[in-house]
Each structure stands twice: as structure tokens, then as C-alpha cells.
């Protein structure tokens, strides 16, 4: 029988000092012996996805205490990728994932907490907490802040839906008037919550459902809706049950590594491909799998991408649907239901509620359930009122979207495409693979060949795009922006958005060893591995070289002879300590970022730290 971790600090005469300090936090004699559960919050006023979380930790804590536990809350940092985008701030985004994971480990292990409720939401916070949870392997439940309502405004006498990406594109489009750009900016992000499309934050919150670590509805129920409160109340109660199951009944099925098994990771990736999730999810699932000591690699993702169809299409791949529409159609469970009926899921998995996949679908799939309260929950919709308050409205759709032929979520027979929304490409400058969000690529450019325009920083590429130096047919190469080379593997949302602003969204490709925002669409290929700074062949591409992209056949090729590439590599190596570094880039890199770069692996490994350099 495992001993409560917290007993280390609450029992024994030699722990009198620790108990004295616990008493100073409000604990009493009656609390010593109860499980201490960390409420891992991420409230900050910097991030709309987290601005409403201040009181939600207290909500969870009250339920923990009522159920017989002791709740202790702390906060992690949270970087807003949208605000950090397009300047030096983006260097810090991906490294913040490791800091979040480490800080959770530090707090939980330093204070010997027994379990956790993770209140996450945005891009690097959910992955960081997920990595920590699987590293620590103590009972955990995730409950996120929820998606933002889609923006809406009237243009040309028509009400249209908007999101953050629309504001970026229109802000750089010289054909858009100042007044229209201002109107879109003011309408794009109307409420608290994670940005309203299938961007990285919402993708990851959906994947925690598929991994079994959060409750049904977690990925899609709006931040503003009153129904979301129940997820927080349930999390506080349920975590005490899970904790007691493990520590008092020796039930290891309550642990995250047993819930988020390899079968669950395969299900999560299957969901990701089917819903056209952010390419960043590949990085984060690979990183989380390593923390769980699961053998889950790019090869596994490639195999899944070749057999899973696209069953859901959401912004930025279409402006017709946002997360509020996914929820109306049944949310994550609705997509999993269609995948299950197609025979594409591992059924022998359980979630934090203790339900198997078939049991979860029977109870929560809107196409199967007989429970009116579940159907009512999935009718929770937007209010269209600007607010930063959680649970501030209770509007409902008149009906569910259960149209699996033409609705937001499709059945296998009516799939958006037989190929899924993400694909892994391989070639002579991406030997370890690269990723493309096929859900956002127009059918006309699934095969594309063009001359390279090479840039060694995102900034130079942006200047070239806006300066008219990139023309239709070009393949924009942005290198030395990988985990080590950036450092920090910047997102390239501004370059891809500005290509659209300049009318080149369907006329150019962009390839990088950096990554993309979940808001990116178009022929945007990222995570090229190995990265340039690690000696990857992307560092050998020269202006004018022809690049051939073949998504249907999963290929990407630099059309230069092996002999020429060998000569270029020899010349690069001859630069000595300057080899595999940008030639004409001035960038101030802090000590903290240099420390990150010194241990960072390429994207095909999840951009995690290279443990071989640490020994032990």
C-alpha cells in the first residue's frame, strides 16, 4: 500500500517544524493525515485565456476540502503567444513549457503533495502541466479555462465570424481601410477564454479529453458559459476519490501513466488528425510521451496520419466553424464517437471518471446518449456579450448539430477528406520529418514546386514578404529558428498571415525549422528536423534551389544533387565554430535562452531537453 507522500511533512516528531509552518497556512490537527492536493492554477492578467481563472482555484479547493482533502493552490507562469508574436518575446514561448513543467515538479515535490488538479488553458500551459503530471505520476485531473466565444461583426451588410488571425491578416492588408481593420480588431476577441478556433490551446485541451485526463466537455465548453462551472466542481470532488483509490486501495489505475497509456496517446493523435488540430500538438504529445516513458514517435504519428480521415473542420481551416460550433455538434466525444464507429480507436482505455471508452460514448456521445442533461450541456452556446468573467451567461442553441453529413462534425462516410488534417513529410532536407496541417492547405497546392527564397530569421522573411520581394510560386525558407537555433522555435504566424495579406496565401509555400501557431493555415511546413543549428540539411538550401512538395505521397525534396549537397556541407563545416549558425543575423539572446538552447533537441523529439547531456 503506497504511503501518502504528504505524511513525510505531517507525521513524526522530527517534522514539528514543518507542521508548525503548515499550521501557519491554516491547517489544524484534523488536517494532518488527509491527502494534500495541489491546485495548480495559471491565473494571470496578461492572457485572455487565463484572466478569468483567479477565483476558479478557490472553487476547486472548496470541493476538495468538502470531500475530505486539504487543498493548496499555487500559480504557474503563462505566456500569451499572440501578444508575444512577431517580436523577440516569441523566443520565450516554447521554453516556458519546460519552466512550467519544472515549476510544477518543484512545488509538488518540495511540499510532498499527494495529487493535483491542473487548471490550464493556453498554448504552453496545458502541455507543461501535462508533462509534469506524467513525470510525477500522481493522481491528476485537468480542467481548463475553456474557449473564447467567436468574434462577430458586420461587413458588407453581412454578419461574419472572426478570430485573432483575421485581425492580423487585415491589419497588414494594404487593401483594407483603417476603419475596417479597426473594426475587425475590436471584434476579433470578445471574451475571456482560449482563442476561438482550433488553435494550439483548444487543440491541447481537446487532447487531454482523449488522453482521459479531463472530463467530457472540457475541450469545447465555452469559458463564459455557466455550465462550465460544473467541470470545476466535479474536478474538486473527483480528485479526492482518485487520490484515495491510489493511496488507500493501492489502485494504480488512478495514476496518469495508466490512464494516458500508449493506447490513449494513439487515440489522442487520431483525434488530432481527425479534427485538424494545431501542428504544435505533435511537439507536445511527443514531449509528454517521453515524460510518461512511452515509446511514441514521429513514426507512430506518420502511420496514423495515413489512415485517419478528417471529420471536423474548424477555424483557421474554415471560417464557418469555431469551438462553440464543435461543442454544439457534441465536442470531443462527438468526434471520438465517429472515429469509434469507423473502427479507428483503441477501446480498452479509461478516463478520470473511471469510464471505458464505450461507456463514455454511451453516456456522452450526442448520437447515442439518452441523457437529456448531457444533450442540454452540449447546447451551451455563446451570448455575444464582451466579458472577462467565467460562467457569466447561460445561452443555449435551439438544437444540437447532429448532422453528420453536412454539419461541423462528419461521419466517416461524409468525411471532409479521406486524408486527415495533419501529415508527416520526409525528404532529403527533412530526414527526421516535418509537419504540415493539411486541413488548412488548399487542394490546388497539395503538390507544389518552386524556387527557394532563403531567410535566416523570421524578421527578414516578414520584411521581404511585406516589401514585395516574395512572389507567386516562391518557396519561403526560414531557418535557424528551431529549438536550438532561435533559440526557442518561434511561431511563424506573422509570415503566413502576411502572405495572405499580400494575396499569396494559395500561391506560395513556407518551410521552416521553426513552428507555426495553431492559427496558421496554407502550405506551411514546419518542424523540419534536424534543424539547421544541429547540422540539418535545411541549412544547405540556397536561393533559387527548387523545392518539390508532395503531400499526398508524404514527400519533400530539395532538387539538388547529392554531390552538390556534400560540397555545401563541407563548406559549412569549414566555417569552424561559426558552422551551422546564421551568417547575417544580429539577435540578442539572454543567458536563460542560451541555457535552454544548450540542451534542446530538434522538433522530431518534441523539442525536449537532451537527457544524454545531463548524465545519470
Curated annotation (Swiss-Prot):
Functions in the biosynthesis of branched-chain amino acids. Catalyzes the dehydration of (2R,3R)-2,3-dihydroxy-3-methylpentanoate (2,3-dihydroxy-3-methylvalerate) into 2-oxo-3-methylpentanoate (2-oxo-3-methylvalerate) and of (2R)-2,3-dihydroxy-3-methylbutanoate (2,3-dihydroxyisovalerate) into 2-oxo-3-methylbutanoate (2-oxoisovalerate), the penultimate precursor to L-isoleucine and L-valine, respectively. Binds 1 [2Fe-2S] cluster per subunit. This cluster acts as a Lewis acid cofactor. Its cofactor is [2Fe-2S] cluster; Mg(2+). It is an enzyme of class 4 (lyase). [2Fe-2S] cluster binds at residues 122, 195. The modification N6-carboxylysine is found at residue 124. It comes from Escherichia coli O7:K1 (strain IAI39 / ExPEC). The gene is ilvD. It catalyses: (2R)-2,3-dihydroxy-3-methylbutanoate = 3-methyl-2-oxobutanoate + H2O; (2R,3R)-2,3-dihydroxy-3-methylpentanoate = (S)-3-methyl-2-oxopentanoate + H2O. GO terms for cellular component: cytosol. One of its GO terms (molecular function) is 2 iron, 2 sulfur cluster binding. InterPro entries: Dihydro-acid_dehy_C (IPR042096), DihydroxyA_deHydtase (IPR004404), DiOHA_6PGluconate_deHydtase_CS (IPR020558), ILV_EDD_C (IPR056740), ILV_EDD_N (IPR000581), IlvD/EDD_N (IPR037237). Belongs to the IlvD/Edd family. The keyword Lyase applies. Mg(2+) binds at residues 81, 123-124, 491. One of its GO terms (biological process) is isoleucine biosynthetic process. Keywords: 2Fe-2S, Amino-acid biosynthesis, Branched-chain amino acid biosynthesis, Iron, Iron-sulfur, Lyase, Magnesium, Metal-binding. Its EC number is 4.2.1.9. This is Dihydroxy-acid dehydratase. Pathway: Amino-acid biosynthesis; L-isoleucine biosynthesis; L-isoleucine from 2-oxobutanoate: step 3/4; Amino-acid biosynthesis; L-valine biosynthesis; L-valine from pyruvate: step 3/4. The active site is at residue 517. Homodimer.
Amino acid at each position: 500500500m503506497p504511503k501518502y507522500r504528504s505524511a513525510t511533512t505531517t507525521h513524526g516528531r522530527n517534522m514539528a517544524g514543518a507542521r508548525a509552518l503548515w499550521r501557519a497556512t491554516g491547517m489544524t490537527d484534523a488536517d494532518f493525515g488527509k491527502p494534500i492536493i495541489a491546485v495548480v492554477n495559471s491565473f494571470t492578467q496578461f492572457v485572455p485565456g487565463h484572466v478569468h481563472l483567479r477565483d476558479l482555484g478557490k472553487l476547486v479547493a472548496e470541493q476538495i476540502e468538502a470531500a475530505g482533502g486539504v487543498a493548496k493552490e499555487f500559480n504557474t507562469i503563462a505566456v500569451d503567444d499572440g501578444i508575444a508574436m512577431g517580436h523577440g518575446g516569441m523566443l520565450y514561448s516554447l521554453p516556458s513549457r519546460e519552466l512550467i513543467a519544472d515549476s510544477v515538479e518543484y512545488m509538488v515535490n518540495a511540499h510532498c503533495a499527494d495529487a493535483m488538479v491542473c487548471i490550464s488553458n493556453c498554448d504552453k500551459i496545458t502541455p507543461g502541466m501535462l508533462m509534469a503530471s506524467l513525470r510525477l505520476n500522481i493522481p491528476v485531473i485537468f480542467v481548463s479555462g475553456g474557449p473564447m466565444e467567436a468574434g462577430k461583426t458586420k461587413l458588407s451588410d453581412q454578419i461574419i465570424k472572426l478570430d485573432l488571425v483575421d485581425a492580423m491578416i487585415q491589419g497588414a492588408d494594404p487593401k483594407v481601410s483603417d476603419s475596417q481593420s479597426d473594426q475587425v480588431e475590436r471584434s476579433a476577441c470578445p471574451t475571456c477564454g482560449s482563442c476561438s478556433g482550433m488553435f494550439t490551446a483548444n487543440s491541447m485541451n481537446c487532447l487531454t479529453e482523449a488522453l482521459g485526463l479531463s472530463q467530457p466537455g472540457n475541450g469545447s465548453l465555452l469559458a463564459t458559459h455557466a455550465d462550465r462551472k460544473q467541470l470545476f466542481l466535479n474536478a474538486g470532488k473527483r480528485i479526492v476519490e482518485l487520490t484515495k483509490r491510489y493511496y488507500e486501495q493501492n489502485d494504480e489505475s488512478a495514476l496518469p501513466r495508466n490512464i494516458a497509456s500508449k493506447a490513449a496517446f494513439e487515440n489522442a493523435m487520431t483525434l488530432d488528425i481527425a479534427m485538424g488540430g494545431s501542428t504544435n500538438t505533435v511537439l507536445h504529445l511527443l514531449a509528454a510521451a517521453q515524460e510518461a516513458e512511452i515509446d511514441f514517435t514521429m513514426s507512430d504519428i506518420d502511420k496514423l496520419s495515413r489512415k485517419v480521415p478528417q471529420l471536423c473542420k474548424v477555424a483557421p481551416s474554415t471560417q464557418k466553424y469555431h469551438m462553440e460550433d464543435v461543442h454544439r455538434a457534441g465536442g470531443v466525444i462527438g468526434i471520438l464517437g465517429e472515429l469509434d464507429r469507423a473502427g479507428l480507436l483503441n477501446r480498452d482505455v479509461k478516463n478520470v471518471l473511471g469510464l471505458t471508452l464505450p461507456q463514455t460514448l454511451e453516456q456522452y456521445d450526442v448520437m447515442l446518449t439518452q441523457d437529456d442533461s448531457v444533450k442540454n450541456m452540449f447546447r451551451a452556446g455563446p451570448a455575444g456579450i464582451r466579458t472577462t468573467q467565467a460562467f457569466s451567461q447561460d445561452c443555449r442553441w435551439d438544437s444540437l448539430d447532429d448532422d453528420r453529413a453536412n454539419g461541423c462534425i462528419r461521419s466517416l462516410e461524409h468525411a471532409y477528406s479521406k486524408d486527415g488534417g495533419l501529415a508527416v513529410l520526409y525528404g532529403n532536407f527533412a530526414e527526421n520529418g516535418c509537419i504540415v496541417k493539411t486541413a488548412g492547405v488548399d487542394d490546388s497546392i497539395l503538390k507544389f514546386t518552386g524556387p527557394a527564397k532563403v531567410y535566416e530569421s523570421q524578421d527578414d522573411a516578414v520584411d521581404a514578404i511585406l516589401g514585395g520581394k516574395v512572389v507567386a510560386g516562391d518557396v519561403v525558407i526560414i531557418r535557424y529558428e528551431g529549438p536550438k537555433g532561435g533559440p526557442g522555435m518561434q511561431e511563424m504566424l506573422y509570415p503566413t498571415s502576411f502572405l495572405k495579406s499580400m494575396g499569396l496565401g494559395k500561391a506560395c509555400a513556407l518551410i521552416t525549422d521553426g513552428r507555426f501557431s495553431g492559427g496558421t493555415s496554407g502550405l506551411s511546413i514546419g518542424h523540419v528536423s534536424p534543424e539547421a543549428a544541429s547540422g540539418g540539411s535545411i541549412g544547405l538550401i540556397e536561393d533559387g534551389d527548387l523545392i518539390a512538395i508532395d503531400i499526398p505521397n508524404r514527400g519533400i525534396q530539395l532538387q539538388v544533387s547529392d554531390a552538390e549537397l556534400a560540397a555545401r556541407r563541407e563548406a559549412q563545416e569549414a566555417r569552424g565554430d561559426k558552422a551551422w549558425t546564421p551568417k547575417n543575423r544580429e539577435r540578442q539572446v539572454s543567458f536563460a535562452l542560451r541555457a535552454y538552447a544548450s540542451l534542446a533537441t530538434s522538433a522530431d523529439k518534441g523539442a525536449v531537453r537532451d537527457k544524454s547531456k545531463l548524465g545519470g
